């Protein structure tokens, strides 16, 4: 461990830009040190905005006074209302977390993970199992209040407030539309400032590209919840990085680098938390959120060991395994869904395909909208309303909106569901992942078959089915040579029509053998080379010798009058020779 301590010490010597940038001189003390009440009222105190894509260094804070009027911009439109109040109950729970959770220490661990491409392994001395105060997820009013906190995105009525720069100003106030790009956090506090509820804004209501942060949410969704940056899947998925190697093969080091960039929601959430702990150093912090905001809330809770309650959150175990979060002793960093005592509770219902991890088919609304929702595993415990079985609902994206969840699910049920972990879940089981330096190109093997035809010479006498020139074809097993005595001058349909010369050497015929058979007749046939081929044989005249008929010798001459299609039309001459006469016995 000495080497690790030395590395951590060296990292601590350098000032991290994101840490220094999020320090705020504002500190709000705890007003009452009495034991924490079971039920408390929470009101909106601050709104924090952290830039991501266009202004990653932007960090602003808006303080809310009790008499401040707000525009409540919800999925059902905008309306004016006063600062809301919510009643929340608490109960103690156990959370397995780091003993030293200072922002600088945790950032050092994350920096080591970035450099080594693996999470830091710490001994049990660095960990503790704490009993902390957390929202009572068995109380319906508490669950309903937390859900309502996540439902609205509040904006100030023009002229009633001013955004302050948390970091030194970079003239972002003069940049039009800065408030539509980034991660928004709403800070609720009880009357004594002993407990703070951080609400992170999730995916915009519109599935397809539109106003607000919808496009940025899509990029973060596809980074967090796809197996490989929305690559290797459906055509409509929006690709957000280039880490795909081959079929179902992905470079995890490349994905980790993309997830940890400064313009991503996880990094923005870490910076928001850094500023919140600077403002409330002695307060107990809870985190909640809906959809993408719920997933980011869970990742933030796992990083710092915070109580988390989410609603219809996207399954977040996959990005948790890639962010380099320090795992407790005896746990697998690649399977955070198997961890116990995380302090995270995920509320959802069975008709929501995003919460259930099934919004990834070829014709699903998520896919058609460009979202690659391939993850299906949650960390912590699942608190699931079975609306499909109880109410006969059909699975649909319309049931994902938080307003419908509040009115049609949470308020409709008399009790909250029982929460339980699901540790046997597996993400991307058909993919292969490897570690590689991003600067080194991944070798790709391509097999190419080339067919080449080689002609030995130019054909001088083409025919109907090939070349009539004399050729020599060498083979490895046998050699066949076809030799023509002369070049064909008169090619025909099925061969050469040039006249040929055949020489026949007379040979004395032996005496026939007489066999006592009735009738004693023996036939011998002698045929020379066929000069007139026919359709089913040779049309040359044949000579047949039947004893005691004299033998016949046929002499052929070159054809002077060839036929129209085949054969020779010359007259043939036959010479008969008398066999030798033997004396009678």
UniProtKB/Swiss-Prot annotation:
What residues sit in the active site?
291 (charge relay system)
Catalytic activity as recorded in UniProt = a triacylglycerol + H2O = a diacylglycerol + a fatty acid + H(+)
Please name one Pfam family that this protein belongs to: Lipase_3
Bilayer-crossing residues are: 1-21
Going by the UniProt record, its keywords in alphabetical order are: Autophagy, Endosome, Glycoprotein, Hydrolase, Lipid degradation, Lipid metabolism, Membrane, Signal-anchor, Transmembrane, Transmembrane helix
Q: Could you tell me which residues belong to the region Disordered?
A: 500-526
Q: Which GO terms describe its molecular function?
A: phospholipase activity; triacylglycerol lipase activity
What kind of membrane protein is this, topologically? Single-pass type II membrane protein
Q: Does the keyword Metal-binding apply?
A: no
Q: Which GO terms describe its cellular component?
A: multivesicular body membrane; vacuolar lumen
Q: Which residues lie on this side of the membrane: Lumenal?
A: 22-585
Q: What is its EC number?
A: 3.1.1.3
Its GO biological process annotations read:
multivesicular body membrane disassembly; neutral lipid catabolic process; phosphatidylserine catabolic process; piecemeal microautophagy of the nucleus
Sugar-bearing residue positions: 171, 193, 275, 340, 437
Report the principal subcellular site: membrane
Q: In this entry, which stretches build a coiled coil? A: none
SUBUNIT field? Binds to both phosphatidylinositol (PI) and phosphatidylinositol 3,5-bisphosphate (PIP2).
Q: Function, please?
A: Lipase which is essential for lysis of subvacuolar cytoplasm to vacuole targeted bodies and intravacuolar autophagic bodies. Involved in the lysis of intravacuolar multivesicular body (MVB) vesicles. The intravacuolar membrane disintegration by ATG15 is critical to life span extension.
As for family, the record states: Belongs to the AB hydrolase superfamily. Lipase family.
Q: What is this protein called?
A: Putative lipase ATG15
Upper classification of the organism: Eukaryota, Fungi, Dikarya, Ascomycota, Pezizomycotina
Gene giving rise to this polypeptide: ATG15
